[in-house]
Amino acid sequence: ITREKLMVLRNHGISRISINPQTMKQETLNLIGRHHTVQQTIDSFNLARKLGFDNINMDLIVGLPGESLSDVADTMEVIRKLAPDNLTVHSLAIKRAARLNIQRERYQDFEIVNTADHIALTSKVAEEMGLFPYYLYRQKNMAGNFENVGYAAPGKAGVYNVLIMEEKQSIVACGAGASTKRVWVQPNPDGTHRIERAENVKDVAQYITRIDEMIERKSRLFTKE
């Protein structure tokens, strides 16, 4: 995250951004293959504030390998000091392509713990920060069988998050791996809505060289009957 990139967003009317630490424990970031540092997250957040962004979300993951309740508490205290406008707390869900799954032997000595105490702690701190829950969703293979919860300050809720979960809103997505979705306004006889998607390639280099193809995919999706 750089000043130049943030200014491009500001100059094009983007008002809500996410700066996602996942955790504020550097050892965990190194373990799970995240290539940013805790200090980079803090510096990026402060830079965005300085440039006028007043609706910033931060994502956390609870249940990361080797992290204790104390580690989660430490992360929440750093978040409290930064005071983001939105906080999204994810329970760890190991996907098929995730590094934790692909290299599972490397992580077998690290316990993955996500308890009601972990979730309650994040909820308590969020409330103390003046953030209130406004959306919730679940995924497969979630640690502790819990859920993901989005918190927001009054007037700062991400409407997009609600719309995408309800699957009632067409969405144009840009970037490698992004999925565009068209929801037909006219309902089916059973009351459901027709939904079709157009996905961008995941590889960044491929996305750049095939950008015209990606644009054409979206164009076809939104012009078809």
For each predicted feature, which ranges?
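Short linear sequence motifs
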Residues: 38, 127-130, 200
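Conserved non-cysteine loop/helix-boundary elements of the Radical SAM core domain that shape
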Residues: 1-122
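Short, glycine-/Ser/Thr-/acidic-enriched flexible segments
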Residues: 63, 141, 177-180
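A broadly tuned preference for mixed-charge, low-complexity surface segments
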Residues: 8-12, 48, 73, 135-147, ...
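Radical SAM enzyme core and accessory elements
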Residues: 150-225
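A C-terminal junction/extension of Radical SAM enzymes
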Residues: 97-174
